[in-house]
């Protein structure tokens, strides 16, 4: 795997080089000292992956990520001194397309050893997603056996389920910021993000919306006006008693938490129609689940190509004819409001594409 390093600190660059070269098959394609240099180098020689610092002279990592994903896109991991202390910047970079984030593994401490192992794990996951890992079969989430549940659908709150990955935080903020405080539906979000950042994502989203955003915990139920966000590296899933749980299965599935696992659990146990949205992201996670939900009568939406940072997941959904509508985030918010209003009034909405 060809990996570039963008960092202005010599010690950090050396630490990253040592960590990367412990894995056969990894090579350093180039090193840049600031964002401007990285944008130029990437345009000439696009690597498989960039390890991007946040704070550098001339151009910082957020702006460099934005320009690279627009001009010569590739996978990007933010590697900086303290991810937790810079959560806002991290999610801003993720909104522009950064795939993940980890503390820089400065040599000599147990914490750095843990960071090094975490970095290699994240790189291995990205390698699977972009087809740069050793050939192995990628397991698919099991298809849910569809059964009906006895709870009458009129007792259940309107539900909006959203799946997102690369570029997701920005798209989520664009949608949630446009929903009113009295939005009459429950919302559940599965964003591909490491559990160490999930609390930070919730805090950041709470600053973007009038709704209440919180981590989904075991035993939670959907509630109007509450936005629940998957909060662990395990897969969020709805159980037959309509409470939320986490499951490790499928263990080797590269997307964690998985949108497909969540969507398929909704198709199995949620005995009411809802609205499901699949946003920007690498790979195909969520496409099968969205298709299944559409077949169960849900209103389904995929983000359009123009507004997607990575047109992978929504593209796969469109190819499966899983999306009733194909829209940018701002229009998705409008559609969600219309869906809730139509359901309250009992007026059906036509099945149209845009």
Curated annotation (Swiss-Prot):
The active site is at residues 165, 192, 285. GO terms for molecular function: phosphorelay response regulator activity; protein-glutamate methylesterase activity; protein-glutamine glutaminase activity. SUPFAM superfamilies: CheY-like, Methylesterase CheB, C-terminal domain. Phosphorylated by CheA. Phosphorylation of the N-terminal regulatory domain activates the methylesterase activity. InterPro entries: CheB-like, CheB_C, CheY-like_superfamily, Sig_transdc_resp-reg_Me-estase, Sig_transdc_resp-reg_receiver. It is found in: Cytoplasm. Residues 2-119 form the Response regulatory domain. Belongs to the CheB family. HAMAP family: CheB_chemtxs. This is Protein-glutamate methylesterase/protein-glutamine glutaminase. The lineage of its organism: Bacteria, Bacillati, Cyanobacteriota, Cyanophyceae, Nostocales.
């Amino acid at each position: 795997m060809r990996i570039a390093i963008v960092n202005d600190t010599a010690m950090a660059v050396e630490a990253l080089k040592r960590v990367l070269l412990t894995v056969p098959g990894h090579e350093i394609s180039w090193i840049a000292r600031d964002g401007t240099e990285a944008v130029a180098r990437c345009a000439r020689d696009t690597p498989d992956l960039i390890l991007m610092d946040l704070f550098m002279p001339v151009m910082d990592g957020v702006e460099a990520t934005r320009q690279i994903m627009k001009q010569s896109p590739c996978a990007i991991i933010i590697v900086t001194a303290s991810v937790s202390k810079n959560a806002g910047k991290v999610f801003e970079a993720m909104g522009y397309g950064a795939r993940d984030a980890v503390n820089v593994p400065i040599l000599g401490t147990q914490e750095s050893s843990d960071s090094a192992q975490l970095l290699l794990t994240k790189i291995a996951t990205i390698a699977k997603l972009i087809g740069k890992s050793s050939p192995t079969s990628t397991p698919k989430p099991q298809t849910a056996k569809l059964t009906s549940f006895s709870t009458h659908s009129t007792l259940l709150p309107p539900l909006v389920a959203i799946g997102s990955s690369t570029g997701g935080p920005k798209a989520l903020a664009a949608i949630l910021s446009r929903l009113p405080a009295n939005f009459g539906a429950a919302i559940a979000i599965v964003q591909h993000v490491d559990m160490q950042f999930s609390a930070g994502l919730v805090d950041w989203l709470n600053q973007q919306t009038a709704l209440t955003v919180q981590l989904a915990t075991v035993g939670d139920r959907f509630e109007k006006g509450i936005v629940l966000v998957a909060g662990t590296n395990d897969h969020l899933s709805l159980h037959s008693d309509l409470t939320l749980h986490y499951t490790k299965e499928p263990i080797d599935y590269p997307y964690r938490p998985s949108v497909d696992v969540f969507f398929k659990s909704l198709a199995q146990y949620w005995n009411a129609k809802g609205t499901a949205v699949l946003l920007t992201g690498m790979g195909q996670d969520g496409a099968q689940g969205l298709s299944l939900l559409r077949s169960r009568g849900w209103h389904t939406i995929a983000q359009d190509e123009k507004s997607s940072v990575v047109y992978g997941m929504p593209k796969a959904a469109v190819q499966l004819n899983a999306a009733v509508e194909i829209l940018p985030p701002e229009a998705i918010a409008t559609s969600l409001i219309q869906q809730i209003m139509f359901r309250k009034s009992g007026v059906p909405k036509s099945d149209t594409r845009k």
